[in-house]
Curated annotation (Swiss-Prot):
This is Putative uncharacterized protein YPR002C-A. It comes from the Eukaryota. It comes from Saccharomyces cerevisiae (strain ATCC 204508 / S288c) (Baker's yeast).
Amino acid sequence: MKAIILGIQNILEVLLEDIGILKMESIFLHTNITNIPHSVLYVSLSYYIINPCTSASSNLDDSFS
């Protein structure tokens, strides 16, 4: 019986740690909301730089099949 209680206690501790991590992540996202315009610009530029490479490689894959 004591082993079962210790097992449940360990599971609860892990779950509480996970919840704490999720709270910290949401706080981190909330505090960095002002950085979104820079992030969107960076992602947009990255997409246009990387996209031609990925579309060219997918065309090559299609030609070999």
